[in-house]
Amino acid sequence: MSLKSVALIENWPVPTAAAGVVRADGTVLGTHGPVGRRFPLASVTKPLAAYAALVAYEEGAIELDEPAGPPGATVRHLLAHTSGLAFDEHRTTAPPGERRLYSNAGFEQLGDHIAKATDIPFAEYARQAVLEPLGMADTTLDGSPAKDGVSTVEDLLRFAAEVQAPRLLDPRTVAAAMTVQHPGTKGVLPGYGHQNPNDWGLGFEIRDAKSPHWTGASSSPRTFGHFGQSGTFLWIDPDARVACVALTDRAFGPWAAEAWPPFTDAVLAEV
C-alpha cells in the first residue's frame, strides 16, 4: 500500500516539503518529497524533548510533581504549559495551574532541570535516551529544547511509531502523557487564538473539540501532536491508528492553516 494522498504536498505553496504516514508497527504507508532532508523543527522539538523527560521520569531521575521552574510549579506544569511562565521570557505572568500559557521558556527550564538532575547536558541526554535507541541518526536537539531541533521525516516516522507502540517507555506512561493535564484550563493555541479549554497532555497538544485547528475535520478528538512555526507538524490519531509527519521550509502562516486540514482529511480517508 502506498498512499496517494501524501503527494498532495505538491500543491502547498512552499519551496520544499516532505511528508510520511506510519502505523504503530513501523509500517510506512506512504512518503513524498525529500524524506531524508534535515529541516528545522521549531516547536515540533517539544514532543521529542517531552519524551526524553518521560524517560528521565521512568529512570527515577525526576518526578512529575517535584518542584521545577518558577516557585510553585512542577515538572508536570512545565510539560503542560501551566507553569505561568511567559511565552519566550523567563518571567511569570500567572500562578501555576491557572492558565494554559504556551511557553518556550517553560521547556527551556525543563531542559535545565533534567540536565541538573542527570548531570548530563539535555541535548546529550535526549540523544542517549530517545534519539539513539530509535535510530534517529539525523536528529539533533542542540540549543533550546523548545524549538531548536532539526530532523527528517524518516526519523520522525520512527518516533511516531514509537509513541504509538512504546518500547522505550511503559505504555501507561505514554497514555498518561496523552491525557489532558489540568482539565478545563483555557488559553491561546498559537496561530489559532483563544481556546476554552485549551487541552494539553505532557508535551503533546490534544485536539479534543478545538476549532479552528491545524489537524483535519475528520481527526478524532483523541488526536495529539504538535506543529511548528517553521511549517512543520506531527500528529498521531489513535482512533485511525496512524501518524503523519510533514516538514517544510516555509514558516507557518495562513497558507498552512488553509492547506494542512484538507491534507490530513485526505490521508485519513485513505488509510
Language-model regions: role of each:
Residues 223-271:
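Structured C-terminal helix/loop/strand segments within mature extracytoplasmic catalytic/sensor domains
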Residues 147, 153, 179-239:
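Active-site Gly/Thr loop motif
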Residues 21-23, 64-68, 139, 201-206, ...:
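Glycosyltransferase-associated regions of secretory-pathway enzymes
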Residues 33-36, 93-96, 107, 141-145:
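Flexible glycine/proline-enriched surface loops and loop-helix/loop-strand junctions
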Residues 31-33, 67, 228, 248:
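Short clusters of small/polar residues that mark proteolytic maturation junctions
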Residues 40-44, 48, 56-92, 102, ...:
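Active-site helix/loop module of the DD-peptidase/beta-lactamase fold
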Residues 2-41, 80, 205, 233-237, ...:
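A short, well-structured edge-of-sheet supersecondary motif
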Residues 47-51, 106-113, 147-169, 176, ...:
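Active-site-proximal alpha-helical segments within enzyme catalytic domains
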